[in-house]
Design a protein with these regions (language model features):
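Conserved C-terminal helix/tail region of periplasmic/extracytoplasmic solute-binding proteins
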Residues: 239, 347-378
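Early extracytoplasmic/lumenal segment of secretory-pathway proteins
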Residues: 34-101
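Hinge/lid segment of periplasmic solute-binding proteins
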Residues: 99-144, 170-173
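Twin-arginine (Tat) signal peptide motif
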Residues: 5, 9-19
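Short beta-strand->loop
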Residues: 108-119, 170, 266-282, 291-294
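Ligand-binding "clamshell"
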Residues: 102-110, 127-129, 134-136, 228, ...
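Mature extracytoplasmic/periplasmic domains
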Residues: 286, 291-352
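Ligand-binding pocket segment of bilobal, Venus flytrap-like solute-binding proteins
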Residues: 187-199, 203-273
Length: 378
């Protein structure tokens, strides 16, 4: 007679089934149980502000996937950072926002041992950034540029009757002048921290004035031109200029250069120009930083370090038409961009540019209230 089989207890039977299943998995894919967890970096950057190739190449080189979201306002970014648990590992604040965000404790110090490509940074730009981030402890410059006037060259000539194009803030802030552009479309950045200081500067006042009377004067000036502004938006003007939908925009230098490139690529006959007004304009710096509550800190450092490779920084500048803070990249940047004084200003032009300081909360609230009233026409 055959010996009867031993009946296993249920717990031991379950364990045997698990081991059998595990063995089957290992036969099909021996590495499966030991596969490394997926590496991810969550990035929050300005819209239209990176060459797509860079994200693809970074993942290919490092194995780190990039989840990439965009914003078009420092206020949007700041609201997420101050609320906490933003979900992002790398963010890109502008200098004067960076300064107060550092004071608010929303960033962690960079581990410079993980950023060997900082050897490529431009000391001049790093020194300017130190105004907002003493010691450059929390941020690395990503791009920098100016806030000026973009225009449709043909329609600007028709509106002004001048062959030389636009060279003054008077085109924007003189109501009689701006009215001439109303029929072909005017857009303006939706950014109190860009437009109010520009109006102050045009009035001969300190663009960093914290005087309430000065700020009211700048708001009153903008209210006087409000009827001629079709829209306040901080990114839509790029395509609108490129397609000829509008003829004038107050915007960021590289954005307007992108509009210029898109029009050329489309062969639509639209010639887009960019002017840094003769009175002067704002010089700003956008910077890479890691939120205090970032969950993928090593991956964040890897991403920042990758962006500071000279060839990568140059690829980015060639695509977005902004200057960067990487000195070693300049030998790889297209000559037309490097020699364009509206992108890389010379010393004479730099002397006419101003930078914005971080405002205290009281003044910031006042500026926001004035801006809302301007936009709503109240």
């Amino acid at each position: 007679m055959a010996r009867p089989g031993r009946v296993l207890p249920k717990r031991q039977l379950g364990r045997c089934r698990f081991l059998a299943a595990l063995a089957a998995i290992m036969i099909l894919d021996p590495a499966a149980p030991f596969a490394a967890p997926e590496r991810i970096v969550n990035v929050y950057n300005w819209s239209d502000y990176i060459a797509p190739k860079i994200i693809e190449d970074f993942t290919r080189e490092t194995g780190i996937k990039v989840r990439y979201d965009t914003f078009d306002s420092n206020d949007t970014l700041e609201a997420k950072l101050l609320a906490g648990r933003s979900g992002y590992d790398v963010v890109v604040p502008t200098g004067y926002f960076l300064e107060r965000q550092i004071k608010a404790g929303v960033f962690q110090k960079l581990d410079k041992r993980k950023l060997p490509n900082l050897a490529n940074i431009w000391p001049t730009i790093a020194a300017r950034l130190a105004k907002y981030d003493p010691g450059n402890d929390y941020a690395v410059n990503y791009m920098w540029g100016t806030t000026g006037i973009g225009f449709n060259s043909a329609k600007a000539r028709q509106a002004t009757g001048a062959a030389g194009g636009i060279d003054s803030w008077a085109t924007v802030f003189n109501p009689k002048s701006l009215e001439r552009f109303q029929h072909c479309g005017v857009e303006m950045l939706d950014a109190s921290d860009d437009i109010l200081p520009a109006a102050l500067y045009y009035l001969g006042l300190d663009p960093n004035s914290a005087n309430e009377a000065d700020l009211q004067k700048s708001a009153d000036l903008i209210k006087s031109i409000r009827p001629f502004v079709r829209k306040f938006h901080s990114s839509e003007y790029i395509n609108a200029l490129a397609t000829g939908e509008i003829c004038l925009a107050v915007g960021f230098s590289g954005d307007i250069k992108q509009a210029q490139k898109r029009a050329i690529e489309a062969k639509n006959g639209v010639d887009v120009g960019y002017a840094i007004p003769k009175e002067g304009a704002q010089l700003w710096f956008d910077n890479l930083a890691i939120p205090r509550d970032a969950t993928n800190v090593d991956e964040a450092h890897a991403f920042i370090n990758y962006l500071q490779k000279p060839e990568v920084a140059a690829t980015n500048s060639n695509f977005v038409s902004y200057a960067n803070g990487n000195l070693a990249s300049q030998k790889f940047i297209d000559r037309a961009i490097l020699e364009d004084k509206t992108i890389y200003p010379d010393e004479a032009l730099m002397s006419r540019l101003y930078v914005i300081n971080a405002h205290d909360p009281k003044i910031e609230r006042l500026m926001n209230r004035l801006w809302i009233r301007i936009k709503t026409g109240r």
